[in-house]
């Protein structure tokens, strides 16, 4: 189990990372919940991915998450593959695994324990699905809406 203080630090890191380097996300409303040592985190996201410095946000998040690497394996699901190429060394150094959302599953679903949807308020959905592993339907990309998913899976502690 992750120490309570570290859990709070993780939430603050997520919040500051989401707002880092872009005015678009400054006033976002956040939903954070804990279930044991898993994190649920949801915030609204700007419609067009190319208008937001996603790479800068992810770099900040990866660097800050180095401290919790013994407690978490973090999986990042992102639609445009170009971000994976640029961030691959940084992601690897923090045990953050990248998966292209469109190629991750042949049946159109992404295996998930805790899914972090940006831009969409899914608090009622989380309330129902909070305590159990579940599968999340693929969210398709259109011209004005881009969704990408942070998948945070709690696995091995320092003592396991």
Curated annotation (Swiss-Prot):
Keyword Cytoplasm found: no
Transmembrane spans: 39-59, 136-156
Alphabetical keyword list: Membrane, Transmembrane, Transmembrane helix
Record bears the keyword Metal-binding: no
Coiled-coil segments on the chain, per record: none
GO CC term (a single one): cytosol
Subcellular location: Membrane
Membrane topology listed for this record: Multi-pass membrane protein
Domain of life: Eukaryota
Family according to the record: Belongs to the UPF0479 family.
Protein name: UPF0479 membrane protein YFL068W
Organism: Saccharomyces cerevisiae (strain ATCC 204508 / S288c)
């Amino acid at each position: 189990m992750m120490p309570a203080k570290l859990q709070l630090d993780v939430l603050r890191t997520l919040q500051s990372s989401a707002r880092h380097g872009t005015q678009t996300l400054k006033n976002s409303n956040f939903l954070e919940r804990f279930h044991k040592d898993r994190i649920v985190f949801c915030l609204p996201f700007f419609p067009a991915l190319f208008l937001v410095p996603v790479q800068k946000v992810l770099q900040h998040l990866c660097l800050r998450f180095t401290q919790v690497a013994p407690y978490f394996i973090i999986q990042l699901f992102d639609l445009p593959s170009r971000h994976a190429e640029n961030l691959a060394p940084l992601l690897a150094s923090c045990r953050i695994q990248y998966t292209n959302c469109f190629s991750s599953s042949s049946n159109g679903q992404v295996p998930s324990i805790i899914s972090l949807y940006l831009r969409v308020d899914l608090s009622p959905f989380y309330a129902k699905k909070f305590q159990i592993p579940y599968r999340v339907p693929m969210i398709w990309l259109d011209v004005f809406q881009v969704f990408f998913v942070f998948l945070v899976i709690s696995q091995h502690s320092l003592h396991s």
